[in-house]
Amino acid sequence: MRLPGMGKWLLPVVLALVVTGCGQPRELSEEQRTALEQRVQARWLALVDRDFGRVWEYSTPDYRRNFPKHLYIHKFSYAVKWELTGVKVLDYDARAAVASVAVRVMSEPTKFTSTASRAIGAVPVTIHEKWIFIDGEWWFSTNY
């Protein structure tokens, strides 16, 4: 079924949607990527140092408003120590302003409970994180 006059407005609407969708950057600029990598590294260095109060400061503003620091610092284990070995930005969703990041760490128990755990030692682990760009700053997202 064809509606009268549909062609007059349908084509401009479709073209406008295509142009607006293409207008957003699909990739991060080098400056944005560097800023994100620095934030991820700084957060992980705070984790390595077990400065969980400082780690909390990298959480989104909404998260920090709803989850107080004094409770946040108790959600971490002291049974594992980490060494940051790398950060890689994997993907960026411009519409959602969300970046996917792979963080590579060496993970090792602080106390070896068996001969096997002592023999294995530190293990390489890749942790996938989501970071959200809000008001000109990258924030760690606990919601993904």
Where are these regions (language model features)?
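Sec-dependent bacterial lipoprotein signal peptides
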Residues: M1-C22
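Short, low-complexity N-terminal intrinsically disordered segments enriched in polar/charged residues
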Residues: C22-D51, E57
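Short solvent-exposed beta->alpha transition segments
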Residues: Q38, F52-A102, P109
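Low-complexity, intrinsically disordered short segments enriched for Gly/Pro and polybasic residues
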Residues: M1, A35, F67, L71-I73, ...
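Exposed beta-sheet edge and beta->alpha loop/turn motif
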Residues: A96-Y144
